[in-house]
Amino acid sequence: MLLTRRAALKSVAVTSIGALTGAVAYGMGNERHRVGLTHATLPVSGLPPALDGLRIAFITDVHHSLTVPADDVTRAVMLANSTDPDLVVLGGDYVTGLDHHYVAPVAELLRPLHARDGVFAVLGNHDDDREMPAALMRNGFTVLKDQRTRVGLRGEALEVAGIRFWTRRPDEIARVLRDARDTTLLLAHDPRRVTEAAALDVSAVLSGHTHGGQVVLPGIGAVARRDFPVLAGVARRQNTSLFVSRGIGTVYVPVRINCPPEVALVTLQRLSDL
């Protein structure tokens, strides 16, 4: 049978639409709930030998809501605890759109998280500045709002600093990090803050916010891309190392394609020659 050009194009279009529909259906019904554990090695310049191999369980962008159920959050907590980490870090966006109905529930779901040397949290752009931090603190988390704390571990010290999402000016960030003498880990929801961190010679940054792109199409890449240094994984800016997690939840559309949710176990690796 002779196939006309119009018929061929129609066939390709139908096939493409069918494939996309199938991918979206899978992303809505399966992939967005398949929370997994990933491992990342983060090279850190000047890391003391005693802190080489320090393990940090990192959870971010939970977005607990009608479309991100308690079961997903509970699985993330279970995976983090299974790693027996030195530190636990939460990277912000615990709810979506400042929805106060989920503030107390998500903090309680995260409460079982534990680590030998502390559990720390920062806020994201979907978190309010009062209810969310109060709920986290009630459940045992140290919430860093443009603050820094010195953590003693393995006979050494690690400066853990955290900034609000809207803290962006170099002088504001410099104020948080002023007089930091030890290796500094900056918790910043937005990975674009690595620019300011690198200018201040911060050792390492942990971020979320990007969701890894959330929808990543073959041959196209992430649909929602901005000027992020990296959408997911490890990057380096001057002497500052950055890790960006894909996070747990979703926003805008309850779908993930080629971008599964993750709990990240980040292991610090000493780079003494940098």
Positions of PLM-derived features:
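Active-site-proximal beta-strand elements of phosphoester/diester hydrolases
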Residues: 53-63, 157-165, 185-189, 241-246
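N-terminal secretory signal peptides and thylakoid transit peptides that target proteins
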Residues: 1-19
